Amino acid sequence: MTGRMPMRARPPTRPAGAASMRRTRPVKRASAGLTPVRAGAVLAMLLSAFAIYGVGASPAFDFGELRIEGATYTDPDAVQRSVEPARGENLFLLSTAPLLAELRAIPTVADARIGIALPGTLVVTLDEREPVLVWKVGSQRYLVDRDGLLLERLGDNAPPEAEQLPAVVDERARSASFGVGVRLDPVDVDAATRLASLTPAQISSSAGRLAVVATDDHGFELRAQPKGWTAIFGFYTPSLRRTDIIPGQVRLLARLLEGREDEIASIVLADEHDGTYIPKPSPRSSAKPE
């Protein structure tokens, strides 16, 4: 017998990284069968799909009538032409973007909206540009907004609102080429708007009315009607002869007319301070018989 201690056997080591194995009991899951709630949801989806198909396929919702709202100055025929390509299409499937683009291209229209009124009516609502003047060229009359855009040509049945707007007569040669969609010079629009807003009372005149005329020879003129004097305001530019001298010219005109209006044939208003007038020719005395 030796003095050595007996060695104990070590338990076997697990391989590195080996996961501990646990036994788990199998879990029984509920069957994914068709419950009443799920069946109801499926039925609702099917009914919605059939309803959408029915609306899209039914001719009862085809575009057949047009209703226009907000059109004071806009020609209804222009609106009709803009939406005519959609005639007969289903209103629920209608793409409105191309129609809105056509409507907004009408000069009198600033913006437009499209809606529907069942069963088959397309509703077009217009936001119109605001006209500030009537621009007369020969026998033609055009609505003009504050940006100088010729919005619409007025016919014989112009709306009452148009008849209340101040008017400008354009006798310049280049105005013969004007038409709807043309944009006037901003300086001309500014001068015309200022002058066309004047009334006889503002310049102490007894004239029945005042007419603003744009000419090639003298620029802007103010004519007292019927058969009165002519005040020559002249040409205006953005820098050299600005329209902000017009209020001073108007005050000068009132002073020159005071007490002598019936004697004046024409007045030239060079600026706010310098103005001259030409009197009417005195009637010649008739020859006395011998």
Residue ranges, per PLM feature:
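Charged, solvent-exposed interaction patches on well-folded alpha/beta domains
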Residues: 1-54, 61, 81, 113, ...
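Structural motif
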Residues: 58, 86, 101-104, 160, ...
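Short extracytoplasmic
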Residues: 63-65, 71-105
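Glycine-centered tight turns that cap/initiate beta-strands
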Residues: 108-111
